[in-house]
Amino acid sequence: ADTICDLEVTEPIHATPIDPPTMSITISVNSSPLAGTEGKKLTSTQIKDRLITEAQNNVGITFSQNANVDSFVISGRGELMLEILLTQMRREGFEMTVSPPKVLYQQDENGNKLEPIEEITVDLDEEFSSKIIDSMNRRKGKLLDLKDTGKDKKRLIFHAPTRGLMGYTSRFLTLTKGTGVINRIFHGFGKFEGEMDGRKNGALIS
């Protein structure tokens, strides 16, 4: 990036680091007998050209083509980013099959498994605090802060693995009866927190 400044200023402004991808999906050409009923752009070439354009304009998206030339692995920063891309493509007339999302893991210098961790900020009515804390604990979330923000209002801050948050927004809205507000940002990669309880309901991103 370029820094525009006074001639006497010689130190450039450092670029803001880009968060790494934390989740991936695989999209494939729809080969079912019903192909073409919901869209007109069906071929792997059309899908690839669209993904190339997306990767050029969206620094948060990367993709690779599988050995099976009819499928592509798309990586992005969370389920919302991937959901937006899929929605845009379908509105543009693309038809494809989509795999369930997968979390992207890393390893540290000692070979230990690391997973993406998010910071979650929740604003809600006090009466729902215990339900949200319990639901986050089930997802390996750790409560960092709890404070009053007004009459009968609370703000909770958690760190939780990305894999535990897939599909959580709808669950959160149910638990808070639609009154809570949840914000998520990437925090970093941390120690793998172990297996979680089985999911009661499935999670779809598109």
Kindly label every feature range from the protein language model.
Residues 1-206:
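Accessory interaction regions appended to the cores of large information-processing enzymes
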